[in-house]
């Protein structure tokens, strides 16, 4: 259970070094490389896998429509859970990255672009991974790490120059994981800077030591508790944040925030729709997710 300490330490050290340069420079530099690499790689892989025997079954699985599934509450619970995970709605990313936005940034438009490109990335991934599974005769309803670490390497192996592609791909995966690690650590680092009035490097060093000691001590026993955190606590916290923003902060505050940086104000219907329709439905689905399972 404690065999991954070395790689855990390596990832932590790299993340802290990037954070010492500041989130604006460190994360931005990493993401400017990571995002184009991911999109280009998946586009190339999508074209390649389309010509492999059996890939058509993967496409049929992806685009098959089951009308009965739309009436199943779990379908919507799973969809919301995927949105929480993929968009990091329940994570520190929204808080941290949002705090670095310029006052001239059109937040609703930026949120729309994030959702659009996230959906494109998810579709590209599906158009590669599911057909790749179909070419090997695997069960297409499988999930978990095997999707990336078993079926994609098999696809790389069949490609001309596949070893080079595999190296580039998993470097990009590493960078994606690193960007997630960075936004998780940025919140406590920023808190120490603000509350204790310490410098950036000193704050990073304190969090690094605490994270290193705690993570090594609990590595072998943490998986069950992490499931509880990601499946229940984070989505619940996100739902409460939505209620606080739309129900407690008040209409004037909300409209001021969402219209900052926009050339044209949002419709007056935005606030009542979010307050009286979106938030209650979202919170209801969160509760159903906790009861029935599926979010996270």
Language-model segments: what does each one mean?
Residues 184-198, 221-224, 243-267:
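Alpha-helical transmembrane segments
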Residues 175-184, 204-214, 230-258:
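Hydrophobic alpha-helical segments of multi-pass membrane transport proteins
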Residues 12-34, 96-104, 187-195, 217-224:
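Membrane-water interface regions at transmembrane-helix termini and the short interhelical loops
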């Amino acid at each position: 259970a404690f065999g991954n300490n070395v790689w855990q330490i390596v990832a932590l050290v790299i993340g802290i070094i990037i954070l010492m340069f500041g989130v604006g420079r460190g994360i931005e530099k990493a993401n400017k490389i990571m995002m184009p690499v991911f999109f280009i790689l998946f586009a190339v892989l999508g074209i390649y896998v389309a010509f492999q025997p059996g890939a058509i079954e993967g496409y049929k699985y992806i685009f098959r429509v089951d009308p009965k599934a739309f009436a199943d509450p779990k379908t919507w619970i799973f969809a919301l859970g995927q949105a929480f995970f993929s968009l990091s709605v329940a994570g520190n990313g929204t808080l941290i990255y949002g705090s670095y936005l310029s006052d001239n940034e059109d937040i609703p438009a930026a949120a729309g672009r994030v959702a659009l490109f996230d959906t494109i990335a998810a579709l590209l991934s599906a158009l590669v991974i599911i057909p790749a599974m179909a070419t090997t005769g695997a069960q297409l309803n499988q999930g978990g790490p095997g999707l990336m670490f078993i079926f994609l390497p098999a696809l790389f192996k069949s490609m001309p120059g596949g070893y080079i592609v595999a190296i580039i791909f998993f470097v990009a995966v590493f960078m994606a994981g690193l960007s997630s690690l960075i936004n998780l650590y940025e919140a406590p680092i920023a808190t120490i800077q603000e509350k204790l009035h310490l410098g950036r490097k000193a704050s990073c060093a304190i969090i690094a030591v605490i994270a290193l000691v705690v993570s090594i001590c609990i590595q072998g026993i943490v998986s069950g508790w992490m499931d509880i955190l990601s499946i229940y606590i984070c989505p619940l916290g996100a739902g409460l944040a939505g209620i606080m923003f739309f129900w407690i902060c008040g209409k004037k505050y909300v409209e001021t925030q969402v219209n900052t940086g926009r050339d044209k104000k949002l419709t007056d219907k935005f606030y009542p729709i979010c307050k009286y329709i979106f938030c209650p439905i979202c919170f209801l689905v969160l509760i159903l997710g906790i009861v029935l399972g599926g979010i996270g």
